């Protein structure tokens, strides 16, 4: 839906047309409970007028003193029975209402999380979609239930209103219709405020995300050291307050408008009600109606006033919530990663990868990130990818792993175009350690087992991969068990150093029985000895498989069978270390720069190579 600032009838009708979609969603999630609540709401709506009529008869029988005591007692007991029944229905309805709220909240959250997990990486890198996700998740805990609650409340109020109007019309039809005029007129203005409120929240989704981020870094451990060291607390608090202050001003303005409109509405309704009550009292004095009738008409007026207000508020709530629900539907209808359909599964290990004239451009960017990439990788090869920042190394890996779709050219896996492959079976053949690897605030077993989720309970294999990555810190502390909570977010969590987290992430990658291993800047959090151990393990595990690693340090790249040199999205050199020193000026410059950075140039280089070669 295109967002506009002026309320138009066609927009109102469009929003209200979302109702069938909302009912369909409700029926899909909780059909049985919803129908029960509607039935209870109808019964609840009828009971007030039934109770009112019985009380009228009771008062009239007492005033006239013409009826037998037994009849009066019968009417009284009937009144009590209706009251008890009304309370029973109310409590049962509250129970189902609470149950419905819990179920619908959990199921919708699950639906949104499932949808998020089915989106492509490019969607999470798109600010527009990220804002849409922010709007949806921010209000999902109450907005969908709010619209359902409004429907139920409106059903109850509508039944009560109709029965009350019918009761009053049996006395004075013309006067009764006056009670409906003001709510109908007021409804338009309430809807206009509702739209204004929605658009305010819609526009500030980006700022909401910024304020959440500031709050996040102020309240979590990963940023604590820099916040203290650079004394950022006051700056960030002020930045947060500036954002929230503008929100408070906007919300106060809306609140002021709502309060003023409510005041005008209540005064008008009370005046009309007073006129009707005055007419009823005069009719009683004239002997046209009895005292019990006057009391019941006064209560009927009150019921009409209250429930017309309730209906109007419910319509406002439905309209306002439907604006949100439209955002939810837009998110749920986002295009997902292509269905696997009848695509070909990988039935054997990956033995060849071929990039044929592959180019890639990020959305909303004019220049290609990768340009005409042609390269082949084969089983038994360990390949290093080097190049300056922004040269396209990580984009190459994201295309290879299927996280991005190829725009131009083809990637062939075992001779099959990657677009024709079943991506789940393909990704099952890949084990990767990304530079921004996950630190799951979960158990040690989960942190490792996520590498092969169907083997999560194979702790013997976990012991093996921990030995492979030489996670000695786990052996030296008897307190580390597979059910040990890692991180500090939850109770009894154990925090790890950056290098220890990386070893756990490496164990997760090696837990998978893959045929293509990828390491993205594996030395970023490791000391030289741990770095040497990491590459020893990598070269050992990737034997007879395909191994790829990105590195800024040529001392590790020298050990690869081949080195791919990238610059400005292009491959500018492929070969061994010695070959590239002769044929690739950029590689030679990188090698000279690395040696220059070592104060003991020649000795340092020899020491590093000796360390890597054992």
Swiss-Prot record:
It is a multi-pass membrane protein. ATP binds at residues 387-394. The chain crosses the membrane at residues 34-54, 69-89, 147-167, 175-195, 267-287. The keyword RNA-binding does not apply. SUPFAM superfamilies: ABC transporter transmembrane region (SSF90123), P-loop containing nucleoside triphosphate hydrolases (SSF52540). The lineage of its organism: Bacteria, Bacillati, Bacillota, Bacilli, Bacillales. PROSITE patterns: ABC_TM1F, ABC_TRANSPORTER_1, ABC_TRANSPORTER_2. Its main location: membrane. Probably implicated in the export process of the lantibiotic subtilin. This is Subtilin transport ATP-binding protein SpaT. It holds the Pfam family ABC_tran. One of its GO terms (cellular component) is plasma membrane. Residues 34-320 form the ABC transmembrane type-1 domain. InterPro entries: AAA+_ATPase, ABC1_TM_dom, ABC1_TM_sf, ABC_transporter-like_ATP-bd, ABC_transporter-like_CS, P-loop_NTPase, Type_1_exporter. Residues 353-593 form the ABC transporter domain. Belongs to the ABC transporter superfamily. Keywords: ATP-binding, Bacteriocin transport, Cell membrane, Membrane, Nucleotide-binding, Protein transport, Transmembrane, Transmembrane helix, Transport. One of its GO terms (molecular function) is ATP binding. GO terms for biological process: bacteriocin transport; protein transport.
